[in-house]
């Protein structure tokens, strides 16, 4: 006997979370609960505003159609919006016990705010020191100076930088000028510095700063391949699609000799814990990019270890549909 419940959540965000010039006041999404006999599977469907192609309303419509068919005994379709494909495939994998329980809860901390506070926090970090800095929100020169200060002050630190295609080539070069050439090898990668792939490639070749593909991964003409100056592929399952698609991308990335990084699209704690399990399974040697829970004020259904944020139980969520 198959049973389905589809819930909706809306979690208030901390002040100051901005996605491509849009302030994100709440994170809204859907939670899927599948039950077959005594087995349960959970999944999260949460298109990211400004980044996902599908809206939450479109995702809900596609999910309802698929869940009604599943409850009647059919399999999920392969051709679905990415957030729906990811959430449904996670729920199915949990139900079938194909998503390993072991999780990688290490985080590359997201560095915002005062460099002095960042320095203290990073200095106290145990183990491999890998942190992430968003660049491109302020002046490129300022970004370069902050990155240089952090790398100079902490000789065992590696930084992942993310520019979200926000720089012209001239601005990207302005950033690079303020990072000492001797420190650039400790930039693990800079995600999509320029507005076009070709400009980003040129930037990497001319500055010696490695880049990673992120937005490009979701474009129809993208192919994973080894090329000079490219060190990593960032995989955001909510934006990429099903578990099978994520597995395929990780495999292609490793075969090309590149690093695959499983990364968050600001999912709730339920989605984040599943991403931690996915990272432990598919990319065990790489710290995932999952330090987004503290942007929210509440956890949903599944706790993230060591988080003190309050938890919303399933019973506290709105039910969209039940079979």
From Swiss-Prot:
Function description: Converts 2-succinyl-6-hydroxy-2,4-cyclohexadiene-1-carboxylate (SHCHC) to 2-succinylbenzoate (OSB).
Pfam families reported for this sequence: MenC_N, MR_MLE_C
Active site residues per record: 134, 236
GO molecular function: magnesium ion binding; O-succinylbenzoate synthase activity
Pathway(s) where this gene product acts: Quinol/quinone metabolism; 1,4-dihydroxy-2-naphthoate biosynthesis; 1,4-dihydroxy-2-naphthoate from chorismate: step 4/7; Quinol/quinone metabolism; menaquinone biosynthesis
Catalyses which reaction(s): (1R,6R)-6-hydroxy-2-succinyl-cyclohexa-2,4-diene-1-carboxylate = 2-succinylbenzoate + H2O
Swiss-Prot/TrEMBL keywords: Lyase, Magnesium, Menaquinone biosynthesis, Metal-binding
Positions contributing to Mg(2+) binding: 162, 191, 214
Biological process terms in GO annotation: menaquinone biosynthetic process
PANTHER family for the chain: O-SUCCINYLBENZOATE SYNTHASE, O-SUCCINYLBENZOATE SYNTHASE-RELATED
Organism field: Pectobacterium atrosepticum (strain SCRI 1043 / ATCC BAA-672)
Matching SMART domains: MR_MLE (SM00922)
Entry protein name: o-succinylbenzoate synthase
Entry superkingdom: Bacteria
Enzyme Commission number: 4.2.1.113
Gene this chain is encoded by: menC
Lineage of the species this protein comes from: Bacteria, Pseudomonadati, Pseudomonadota, Gammaproteobacteria, Enterobacterales
């Amino acid at each position: 006997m198959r049973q389905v419940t589809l819930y909706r959540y809306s979690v208030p965000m901390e002040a100051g979370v901005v996605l491509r010039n849009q302030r994100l006041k709440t994170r809204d999404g859907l939670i899927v609960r599948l039950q077959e006999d005594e087995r349960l599977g959970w999944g999260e469907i949460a298109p990211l505003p400004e980044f996902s192609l599908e809206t939450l309303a479109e995702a809900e419509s596609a999910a309802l159609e698929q869940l009604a068919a599943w409850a009647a005994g059919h399999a999920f379709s392969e051709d679905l919006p990415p957030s729906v494909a990811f959430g449904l495939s996670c729920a199915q994998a949990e139900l079938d016990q194909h998503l390993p329980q072991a999780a990688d809860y290490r985080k590359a901390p997201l560095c915002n705010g005062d460099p002095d506070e960042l320095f203290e926090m990073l200095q106290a970090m145990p183990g491999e020191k890998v942190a992430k800095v968003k660049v491109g929100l302020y002046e490129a020169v300022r970004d370069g100076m902050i990155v240089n200060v952090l790398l100079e002050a902490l000789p065992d630190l590696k930084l992942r930088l993310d520019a979200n295609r926000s720089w012209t080539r001239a601005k990207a070069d302005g950033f690079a000028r303020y990072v000492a050439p001797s420190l650039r090898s400790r930039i693990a990668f800079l995600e999509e510095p320029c507005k076009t792939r070709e400009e980003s490639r040129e930037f990497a070749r001319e500055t010696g700063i490695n880049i990673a593909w992120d937005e490009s991964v979701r474009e129809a003409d993208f192919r994973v391949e080894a090329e000079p100056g490219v060190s990593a592929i960032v995989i955001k399952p909510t934006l990429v699609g099903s578990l099978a698609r994520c597995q395929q991308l990780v495999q292609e990335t490793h075969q090309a000799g590149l690093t695959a990084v499983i990364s968050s699209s600001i999912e709730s704690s339920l989605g984040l814990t599943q991403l931690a399990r996915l990272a432990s399974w598919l990319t065990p040697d790489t710290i995932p990019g999952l330090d987004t829970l503290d942007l929210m004020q509440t956890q949903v259904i599944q706790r993230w270890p060591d988080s003190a944020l309050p938890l919303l139980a399933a019973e506290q969520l709105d039910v969209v549909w039940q079979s």
